[in-house]
């Protein structure tokens, strides 16, 4: 939530397990991280949590994902929602049918029965992203019963900060980066011999790139380079399996609530 002064604090206030984010009580969760930190993966994990609740009998909340890299010039958040809704549910019927279905979606939004997962504040390709961000702020204010989970990059969030500063119930979270010790443990779990793990550790320390290992994407590339494809296979993009599970077992740094 906003700081008592009305501003987001830059100081860390504690930690939170990623799986607990859905129960954090924030109406808006801003999930920030460096490139390759797993922001989209966290979002997908949250969507699955909502889906599990749905399958277990809680049919009140429908998760809907919106990719901001698909927003085109001049579009507002309402336009992005309509596009995502049509694509997500395969609505290819007549325009009248689309309007009727979307009117029902708007009713669900007004009732707070849709949770929106908005991915990529940093991926807006429009010439004036601040206009879209303003429309997003208005959208959040309009549908004040809905929950929003939004991802973006830490350093680029400053440009959006003002738009979220005045919104009540907004939590800001940073993805914590994984430590070298945790990565070495992961390599042991993969079955690498201790001598290769020690060699990997020494190469990292000598090169002074320990901090670069902190995100899944960087780790995949560095491990493949130093260990070789015979010992470490780069997981498929978008399906990094056990590697991302290790990062998901890390935590979120609570920046402001």
Language-model segments: which ranges?
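P-loop NTPase signaling cores
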Residues: 2-256
């Amino acid at each position: 939530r906003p700081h008592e002064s009305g501003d987001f604090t830059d100081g860390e206030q504690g930690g939170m397990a990623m799986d607990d984010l859905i129960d954090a009580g924030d109406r808006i969760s801003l999930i920030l991280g460096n490139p390759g930190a797993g922001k989209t993966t966290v979002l997908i994990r949250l969507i699955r949590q909502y889906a599990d609740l749905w399958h277990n009998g809680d049919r009140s909340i429908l998760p809907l994902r919106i990719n901001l890299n698909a927003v085109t010039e001049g579009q507002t958040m309402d336009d992005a929602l309509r596009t995502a809704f049509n694509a997500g549910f395969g609505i290819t019927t007549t325009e009248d049918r689309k309007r009727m279905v979307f009117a029902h979606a708007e009713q669900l939004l007004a009732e707070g029965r849709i949770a929106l997962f908005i991915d990529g504040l940093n991926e807006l390709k429009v010439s004036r992203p601040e206009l879209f961000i303003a429309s997003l702020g208005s959208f959040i204010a309009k549908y004040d019963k809905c929950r929003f989970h939004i991802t973006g990059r830490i350093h680029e969030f400053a440009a959006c900060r003002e738009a979220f500063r005045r919104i009540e119930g907004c939590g800001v979270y940073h993805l914590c980066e994984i430590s070298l010790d945790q990565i070495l443990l992961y390599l042991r779990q993969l079955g690498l011999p201790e001598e290769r793990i020690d060699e990997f550790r020494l190469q990292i320390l000598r090169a002074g790139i320990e901090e670069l290992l902190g995100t899944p994407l960087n780790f995949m590339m560095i491990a493949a380079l130093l260990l070789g494809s015979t010992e470490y296979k780069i997981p498929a993009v978008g399906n990094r399996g056990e590697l991302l599970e290790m990062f998901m077992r890390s935590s979120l740094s609570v920046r402001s609530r």
